[in-house]
Amino acid sequence: MAAASSNGLVVPAAFPPPVNPVEEFVGPPTDPEEVRFEVGVVIVGGGPAGLACANRLLQLLAEDEALTERLGEVPVAVVEKGKVCGAHNLSGAIMRPSAMNELFPDVAPSDWPTYGEVPGEAVYLMLTGKQSVRIPTPPPFKNHGNYVISVAELSRWLADKAEKAGAYLLTETSAAKLLVDHNKVVGIRSGDKGRGKDGEPLGNFEPGSDVLAKATVLAEGTWGHLTGAAIRAFDLGTEDSQVWALGVKEVWEVPTPLTKVIHTLGWPLRTAAKYKEFGGSWIYPMGDDKVSIGFVAGLDYADVEFSVHDVLQQFKTHPQIRGILEGGKRIAWGAKAIPEGGYWAMPKLAAPGVVIAGDSGGMVNVPELKGIHYAMHSGILAAEHIYGQLKANSSDFSSYDAAVHDSVIGKDMFRTRNMKQPFSKGFFVGGAIVNAMVATKGRLPGGHWKTHPDKDQPMFRGGRAKGYPKPDGNYTFDKLSSVYISGNETRDDAPNHIRVQKEVPRELAEMWQWMCPAGVYEVPEDAEGDGPVDVIVNYTNCVQCGAITAKGGRLTAPEGGDGPLYQIT
């Protein structure tokens, strides 16, 4: 077993999960030819990127009868592990309208699934647990002309459009393996269903199937199981590591309408560089009677006791926030990791037979808190380049990578390429550097500021937990009651889809316990002192947020249909 770092602090990377992605999750088709499911294009992930791709591809095929016929009975299939498309989608969210306008030019914004245009905005610096000051809205936070949405609702709307256009939606179906033949991706294998917790077939067992396709689109979201395997198998990674943040969100019914979108910086995050606490909050109106509130923090933090879920509960105790929520009722909760590595951490986006789209490709603009329109734009580009190559009988989709970098996605992300990294120097120093970058549109300070894996951050006990409020079940909440309202219905006897080392230092076990918003990891009550801990993994609680992959473990494909059932997140 690897040791802790030389300064005596525990480093999660020193205790890697027992997994070999290429050996386990990449391989040739195994089903006999007569039982294989053959489609034209298989899209993994029923979120904005995958469904934008499906819709655009079907628009193109509607004008090309010859290619549609060549692609077979099912020209476009979408594989989605959630119970429905959108079940695992969560975001703030404010959406730029550019991709919707491009994809559906004949659909009026009033017919989109939104809560209307941003009505106004404010940014506050939270000084303490009782004080705040409004500050001028930084340029990246200006949202005039953008729309407040639920990304879960958007995904369901896009899925309905795609299905009506001819897409075959395979919901409750995980994509467990990337099928590769002669160094070319030829599809995916779906996961088994009906296995017990030890992997044994139960009475309702259904084996997975080979889904063969002329093109495969990996649009799996923030942590892509097959995307990670493809990056390893085809050497698609860059010299910079992807890094993540974790967002935890609640939706509240409130008695008084909120008339503007709000972002905050500062408290309850600590500003000293040693804690490496980077993030902030949002509060968005969802019509007259609901608000979305959430907190996002980088997963490169250093304190063992840091918990984004509990930081959100602490944030809600501020008098200014109570003034918005009190008298209301929490009706939804969820959590999701967010790729924050920016331009330098984007992988190569194409290999023979396959492309990567959306969050799986790290397409998030960190300072602007935007990614949904990038996901959709990348899906549109993927569809157009796949269509062109299939028409030419080619599986070389490398032109897609260049197209993304030449598009609004690549241009925006290059401009903001160094705007996360400076905050490793602390809130005030990092903020000053980023202000210079914003003012010069990324030119100064220029250069290449490297990212470092979240799991390489040494961890220490910094006393974070003493600031968390005790859950009262009405205004502040524990993790398990939160998982309950996420709609999570994972079977108690389902197989474990989480890989972590079981025997780890107590600090690491405690870090996982605090980190996880769903209460998956637990330190046994009888664990002695500071010795190694046999971590309890309550995997049926998992809402598949992806944070464990950033901090030393690894999610694998769950059984299709497991996990949350997000409705308005």
Which positions does each model-derived feature cover?
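Iron-sulfur cluster-binding cysteine motifs and their immediate structural context
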Residues: A509-T569
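Glycine-rich Rossmann-fold phosphate-binding loop(s) that bind the pyrophosphate
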Residues: G45-P48, K81, V151
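Extreme N-terminal leader/targeting segments of oxidoreductases
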Residues: M1-V41, R56-P75, R195, S482-R506, ...
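C-terminal auxiliary extensions adjacent to catalytic cores
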Residues: F423-N474
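FAD-binding beta-loop-beta segment adjacent to the flavin cofactor pocket
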Residues: A335-V366, S481-D493, E503-M515, E522
